[in-house]
Amino acid sequence: MDLDVKEIIKNMNLKFRNIEGKKLLLAISTDKYGNVLMTAFMSEESLKKSIETGFMHYYSTSRDKLWRKGEESGNIQKIINVFRDCDGDALLFTVEQTGWACHEGYMSCFHNKIDLNTGKSTVVGNKLD
C-alpha cells in the first residue's frame, strides 16, 4: 500500500530552515547527465505538490508564493529521481527538462563563468530559442 504524501515527506527526514521568515530547503535540479540546471527554494507545500504531480514546484521568496516550474514559459521539469543531502536541508532532483531551465533563456542558470582574478563574468553557452 502506498503511503500518503505527508507520510512520505516525514520519512524523508528533512530539516526545513528558516529563510526569509519561511521554512524552506534548497532544491537543486540536474539533467540526467548531472549538469546543474538551477537552484531554488522549496517549502513543504511545494515539495508535496512536486511529489503529487511528478513535476517540479518551488517556493519563490521574491514573489512569496509557490510556483510550478514552467507555469508561464512551458519549460517544465519532470522528476526522475530525488536525493537528500547528509544534513537533510537540501534535495537534489534529477529531472527531464523541457525547454530551458533559466528564465534568461539558457539551459542552465549557471551560465556566467567568473574569473577569480578579476571577479568579472563571461557568459558561456548559447541562448536557446
Curated annotation (Swiss-Prot):
Binds 1 Mg(2+) ion per subunit. Belongs to the PRA-CH family. Zn(2+) binds at residues 86, 102, 109. It catalyses: 1-(5-phospho-beta-D-ribosyl)-5'-AMP + H2O = 1-(5-phospho-beta-D-ribosyl)-5-[(5-phospho-beta-D-ribosylamino)methylideneamino]imidazole-4-carboxamide. Homodimer. Catalyzes the hydrolysis of the adenine ring of phosphoribosyl-AMP. One of its GO terms (molecular function) is zinc ion binding. PANTHER family: HISTIDINE BIOSYNTHESIS BIFUNCTIONAL PROTEIN, HISTIDINE BIOSYNTHESIS BIFUNCTIONAL PROTEIN HIS7. The lineage of its organism: Archaea, Methanobacteriati, Methanobacteriota, Methanomada group, Methanococci. InterPro entries: PRA-CH, PRib_AMP_CycHydrolase_dom, PRib_AMP_CycHydrolase_sf. Its EC number is 3.5.4.19. The gene is hisI. It is found in: Cytoplasm. The keyword Magnesium applies. GO terms for biological process: L-histidine biosynthetic process. Keywords: Amino-acid biosynthesis, Cytoplasm, Histidine biosynthesis, Hydrolase, Magnesium, Metal-binding, Zinc. It comes from Methanococcus maripaludis (strain C6 / ATCC BAA-1332). HAMAP family: HisI. One of its GO terms (cellular component) is cytoplasm. Its cofactor is Mg(2+); Zn(2+). This is Phosphoribosyl-AMP cyclohydrolase. Its main location: cytoplasm.
